[in-house]
Amino acid sequence: MTSKEDGKAAPGEERRRSPLDHLPPPANSNKPLTPFSIEDILNKPSVRRSYSLCGAAHLLAAADKHAPGGLPLAGRALLSQTSPLCALEELASKTFKGLEVSVLQAAEGRDGMTIFGQRQTPKKRRKSRTAFTNHQIYELEKRFLYQKYLSPADRDQIAQQLGLTNAQVITWFQNRRAKLKRDLEEMKADVESAKKLGPSGQMDIVALAELEQNSEASGGGGGGGGGGCGRAKSRPGSPALPPGAPQAPGGGPLQLSPASPLTDQRASSQDCSEDEEDEEIDVDD
């Protein structure tokens, strides 16, 4: 194509060309001149050969994966003669495959690595608690009664005396002060709740506590004999009288009002006896 276009060129254009264009090529150049048209560049045998070799390399690589045996010598020689472009492509594919495998292993947690390649920080192991002996606890409690805070000299003395370290003594006193603070807060809360109940509620609580103690001491109150008459019938509005009730000024027993608990107990015993007398027993013939 270039020769025909040059033949058809006008004679004026031939005159405009410089005399350097008519010079022959140098004698020492053995390589032929390469035409710069698109068709000539695409039709170069070296490019075709590189593409064909690249395709053959891919085919041989696929056959190597599926075939049980190794490649023949001819195939290996063909792979060794591939172009640098094919070698670069093969290297990149292997690199990406390796990255995919490492990411999958990290996701599965095989080697303890995260996806970003950072090792998971191990959990901080909790220190074991020091087991104090009874003698050590007794000495520490005795010292804590009159000294809540220790000086460095006292701390060293106690640690040497009980066979403990300074850190153990410091930790024990810190925990003991915290426990004392919690106990005081609980006591304050109990006092506040008792104040809210009022005097009647406090008397009821005291009476219930004394009744529980008496029932535990007497072993259940005589077994509740008489078919349930051992339980006194309480009337509404009659306050319970504690055991340490006040006596009369003369030293004799205190005169109880008709609504007192003792009169209620006597009345309940009479009611129980009347119920027992009036109770009928059915006997089968």
From Swiss-Prot:
GO cellular component, one term: nucleus
Ranges of compositional bias, category Gly residues: 218-230
Biased composition (Basic and acidic residues): 1-20
PROSITE patterns: HOMEOBOX_1, HOMEOBOX_2
Keywords: Developmental protein, Differentiation, DNA-binding, Homeobox, Myogenesis, Neurogenesis, Nucleus, Transcription, Transcription regulation
Biased composition (Acidic residues): 272-285
Residues covered by region (Disordered): 1-36, 212-285
Recorded GO MF terms: DNA-binding transcription factor activity; DNA-binding transcription factor activity, RNA polymerase II-specific; sequence-specific double-stranded DNA binding
Superkingdom as given in the UniProt entry: Eukaryota
GO BP annotations listed: cell population proliferation; glutamatergic neuron differentiation; heart looping; muscle organ development; negative regulation of cell population proliferation; negative regulation of glutamatergic neuron differentiation; neuron fate commitment; neuron fate determination
Pfam families, A to Z: Homeodomain
DNA-binding region: 125-184
Cellular compartment(s): Nucleus
InterPro entries: HD, Homeobox_CS, Homeodomain-like_sf, HTH_motif, LBX_TF
UniProt xrefs under PANTHER family: TRANSCRIPTION FACTOR LBX, TRANSCRIPTION FACTOR LBX1
SUBUNIT field: Interacts with SKOR1 which acts as a transcriptional corepressor.
Function: Transcription factor required for the development of GABAergic interneurons in the dorsal horn of the spinal cord and migration and further development of hypaxial muscle precursor cells for limb muscles, diaphragm and hypoglossal cord.
Identification of the protein by name: Transcription factor LBX1
Organism for this UniProt entry: Rattus norvegicus
